[in-house]
Every structure is written in C-alpha cells, then in structure tokens.
C-alpha cells in the first residue's frame, strides 16, 4: 500500500518551508519512525518520520523546493523493506570508485565545516551512504578545538580552496532563517519610530555575589551554574512591572498590555540567532532561569528548539557582550515594543564620592518604539534596572 509522505502541519505563524535534506533515496528501505526528510522553516528545522516500514517509492519535492503545510513530499510503499534488501547486495562491488567522490554534507554540516575551516573530506560521515551529518561536523569541530596546540600539522594538510591572490566571489542562497531575520529587521525599521537610550551599570555587586555563592548555588541546584543573565532577567521583570508600557505591544490602533512577562533570550546557533522564550519569567527563580537558558542553548546547538519555544514573548534581552561588543543599538523584535542590549563588562575609571575608582562597568541599551513608549518611561526603565543590579539584594526583597 502506498503512503503519502507529507510536510508537517505548520502553525499560523509559518507560511511555508523548504526541503532541506532527504535522508533516503527512491528504492531505499526505511523503518517506522525513521527520519526521512528535513523541512527548514524560518524558525526551526522540522523532521518528517516514516509512518511505517517500507521503501521510498517516489520523491515529489526535491531539496531546495518550497512546500506548504501538509503538502505531498513523496510516497512510501508499505511493507517493501524486506524485498528491497537483496537489491542492495551488489552495492559493495560498486563502492570502490565512490571513495574518490567528494563527501556528501547536510546543509547544517556544511555550514559548521565552513565556519570552523574544516575540510569536508577530513570528516568521517556516519550517515546513510557516508553522508556527513550535523553531529559528525560538530564532533569534528570539537576535536579540532581540543587538539593540542603543539600539533597543528594535520589541520594544515588540507589544500587551500583558492590560489593566493585570486579575486573570488561565492554566491549562496540565504537560509530561510536568515531571510526571515532580514525581512523582520527591515519591517521593524520601517514600521516603528525606534529610538535607543543608554545607561551604565556597576557590575561589581553582582560579580561579588556570584563569586561568593556560585559553588554553593551549583551544588544546591544539581549542577546549574549561576551566571549574569538570570540577574538581568529578574531585574527586567521587576522593571517591566513598574513600566507596563515597555511590556506592551501595538495591535492596529489598540495597545495590548500583557499581565505577564515572557522574556525572549537571544541565543546563538549554527543557523543564526534565535530567540527562545522564558514563559512567565515573573514566577521563575534564578536557578530556573539559568536552567531554562542552559537548556535553550543545548537545544539551539542541536537544532532541536520547537516553534512553541520561539513563539511569542513580550520583551527581549540580547547579550552582545559575549562576543565582545562594547556598545550597540539593538533592533526591536515586532510586535514587541522594546529590547534590552547587554554588553561587555570592562573595567573603567569612575568618579565615586570624589575619588577615582576602577570598576567593572557595562553599558545597557534599551531600544524602544516611541509610538508607544515615551522617553521618560524608557529612561526610568533603565534606571530601575541599574538600581536593582547595583544592589541585587533588592531583587530578593522586592523593594
């Protein structure tokens, strides 16, 4: 019996997707719940699994094709796996010349290899037919990073892609995520009256508190490490309560005030920057916030974030400081009306009670939609965050 292989049902926020990778070819056997094809959307990569044991009979949508929700991708002949197995027996005889061919990399694996300057033929593929999977590329990248500094010779054996002095250009299509990010950035710039206000915060109190309790915190909370982001999320939640307009959104001619704080935290992934959301952050402890962010980071690296985890949010925090950014003007993520930018902690001479003191300082930037948020609200929001972070006991005392 023929079974239709269909694209997943997309949520309303996703119009279509792209066939990223077929893991099976026509004539190849599959088992029930085995991965057949990846569909890339502007938010996540969705996996299509086999509904039954059988053989891939036909591929209707090729890699790179655009597909709609529930659209036919191919056909699976149920129960044909047993008869298809003998046909694969002659393959070893023809395998010899295949060794000379360039390895096949999945899109995610190719991106990781390029970003880490790893030659494709140096990665051992564990996928079907020797295909290099994302996990293979990640393992190769980790192996390269952990290689002893005194043994750089193996990495140098890869031949350069282009001769020195060549004026080389390379044209590649945008990923759906990058295209969607570009679209939303242009939309934000053109549809909002966006402004950015700045302040700076003395990070010494938070750093001292973290240094004092980080070991006990990790032991008490089953290995969850105490970072800086949880303090910023806590401070942002309190500041949003005091300035509800910063937590609101515009819907047509209406202002929607949200009685909850869903905080989006920007996380870097192989596909680009993604923003999973901490739901009801106002009820979360420091440990729950850190644990949630850590879990998001792992899922982002593995490409396992779900659409639900990246949908919604009433306010976003972006930390360019992890990349060394000293100052920036983050762009608001519609339909939200504000975003907080964290930056690098850097020691600077500061005047304190008439004395010059070296303090670890961080610039904070709040970009906001001036159609809804007045300058007074934006400045007050940042001042509240500054006050709470410079006296973190207030976060616990709710004062």
From Swiss-Prot:
One of its GO terms (biological process) is tricarboxylic acid cycle. GO terms for cellular component: cytosol; oxoglutarate dehydrogenase complex. PROSITE patterns: BIOTINYL_LIPOYL, LIPOYL, PSBD. Its cofactor is (R)-lipoate. The active site is at 370, 374. The modification N6-lipoyllysine is found at residue 43. Residues 2-77 form the Lipoyl-binding domain. This is Dihydrolipoyllysine-residue succinyltransferase component of 2-oxoglutarate dehydrogenase complex.
